[in-house]
Amino acid sequence: MNTVVENSLEQARPVFPFTAIVGQEEMKLALILNVIDPKIGGVMIMGDRGTGKSTTVRALVDLLPEIQVVADDPFNSDPKDPELMSQEVRGRLQRKETVPITTKKISMVDLPLGATEDRVCGTIDIEKALTEGVKAFEPGLLAKANRGILYVDEVNLLDDHLVDVLLDSAASGWNTVEREGISISHPARFILVGSGNPEEGELRPQLLDRFGMHAQIGTVKEPNLRVQIVEQRANFDAAPLEFRETYQDSQAQLGNQILEARNLLPQIQLEYDYRVKISQICSELDVDGLRGDLVTNRASKAIASFEGRTEVTPEDIFRVIPLCLRHRLRKDPLESIDSGDKVRDIFKRVFGYE
């Protein structure tokens, strides 16, 4: 099936509404905060099979607003921001050419488990480059993911080198392909969302540390909630469009709340005393490097903006700090306490909540 047909089918297929998802609050919060501030650095979602990981990610993308892009550009170039433009678009603007502008939904790109590095990064047609003297570049998935979300299911089963490539691009916002002395770069600023089942193996600590957040989800045990989830799904499958209509108002409200939070974010204040306490917690937990401190500061500001406030409270920090630090702790086989609970315990002591 060609790409155009696939895309139209994807757009025609109704998506389960984000606000209809029952439970899994930790995962939903981590995703929303990454959309408010993509510099948080993505999220790794670990949990049992069938707990709605991919459903929730797709639902979030459906919730997000449309963005302006250059119409005939495969990199989703932003017509106003040079940092998010391909070299070709930048060149056209420098030559004072008019570029066609259109709007489109923020895209979510799925990374297949068996994808090669060429499929992910793109390829250079060396023969064409040598014979015609042009940089013939075939964009990969990273180009398609620019200004969107890159979703990797079962990321713990992906080749380590490929995970490294994804994390490098997510951190720098650029993808560079080099072949036979020819180098091509393009913007690749995306939110990286990985998911996996811990029974199938963990990511190496060096890779795990580079995800901004780590959400843990489990199968819902409460019988009443399970019944509610099953009924929701059955109602959606029976009449998806009517089901989506039921949640139209709550979807619009959440979408607006996220947009307002993004606009408010630059004004958020995090007290010096709180920043010191965050760093003290990281130090006491023996967290390597400063990523934990940085991400916790960013996430605390993002949640305050989501709540419509301009100042971060200790409660904001308490809600996000397990997400930001649990995957950065050194594993002790003799310790039975959950890593998230360990972070909360240290937080309570440092902030005087005991």
Curated annotation (Swiss-Prot):
<dbReference type="GO" id="GO:0009570">
    <property type="term" value="C:chloroplast stroma"/>
</dbReference>
<dbReference type="InterPro" id="IPR041628">
    <property type="entry name" value="ChlI/MoxR_AAA_lid"/>
</dbReference>
<dbReference type="Pfam" id="PF17863">
    <property type="entry name" value="AAA_lid_2"/>
</dbReference>
<dbReference type="GO" id="GO:0005524">
    <property type="term" value="F:ATP binding"/>
</dbReference>
<dbReference type="InterPro" id="IPR027417">
    <property type="entry name" value="P-loop_NTPase"/>
</dbReference>
<keyword id="KW-0934">Plastid</keyword>
<dbReference type="InterPro" id="IPR003593">
    <property type="entry name" value="AAA+_ATPase"/>
</dbReference>
<comment type="function">
    <text>Involved in chlorophyll biosynthesis. Catalyzes the insertion of magnesium ion into protoporphyrin IX to yield Mg-protoporphyrin IX. The magnesium-chelatase is a complex of three subunits, CHLI, CHLD and CHLH. The reaction takes place in two steps, with an ATP-dependent activation followed by an ATP-dependent chelation step.</text>
</comment>
<keyword id="KW-0436">Ligase</keyword>
<keyword id="KW-0067">ATP-binding</keyword>
<keyword id="KW-0602">Photosynthesis</keyword>
<feature type="disulfide bond" description="Inhibitory under oxidizing conditions">
    <location>
        <begin position="282"/>
        <end position="324"/>
    </location>
</feature>
<dbReference type="Pfam" id="PF01078">
    <property type="entry name" value="Mg_chelatase"/>
</dbReference>
<keyword id="KW-0150">Chloroplast</keyword>
<dbReference type="InterPro" id="IPR045006">
    <property type="entry name" value="CHLI-like"/>
</dbReference>
<keyword id="KW-0547">Nucleotide-binding</keyword>
<dbReference type="GO" id="GO:0015995">
    <property type="term" value="P:chlorophyll biosynthetic process"/>
</dbReference>
<dbReference type="GO" id="GO:0016851">
    <property type="term" value="F:magnesium chelatase activity"/>
</dbReference>
<dbReference type="InterPro" id="IPR011775">
    <property type="entry name" value="Mg_chelatase_ATPase-isu"/>
</dbReference>
<comment type="subunit">
    <text>The magnesium chelatase complex is a heterotrimer consisting of subunits CHLI, CHLD and CHLH.</text>
</comment>
<dbReference type="InterPro" id="IPR000523">
    <property type="entry name" value="Mg_chelatse_chII-like_cat_dom"/>
</dbReference>
<dbReference type="GO" id="GO:0016887">
    <property type="term" value="F:ATP hydrolysis activity"/>
</dbReference>
<comment type="similarity">
    <text>Belongs to the Mg-chelatase subunits D/I family.</text>
</comment>
<keyword id="KW-1015">Disulfide bond</keyword>
<dbReference type="GO" id="GO:0015979">
    <property type="term" value="P:photosynthesis"/>
</dbReference>
<protein>
    <recommendedName>
        <fullName>Magnesium-chelatase subunit ChlI</fullName>
        <ecNumber>6.6.1.1</ecNumber>
    </recommendedName>
</protein>
<comment type="pathway">
    <text>Porphyrin-containing compound metabolism; chlorophyll biosynthesis.</text>
</comment>
<keyword id="KW-0149">Chlorophyll biosynthesis</keyword>
<feature type="binding site">
    <location>
        <begin position="47"/>
        <end position="54"/>
    </location>
    <ligand>
        <name>ATP</name>
    </ligand>
</feature>
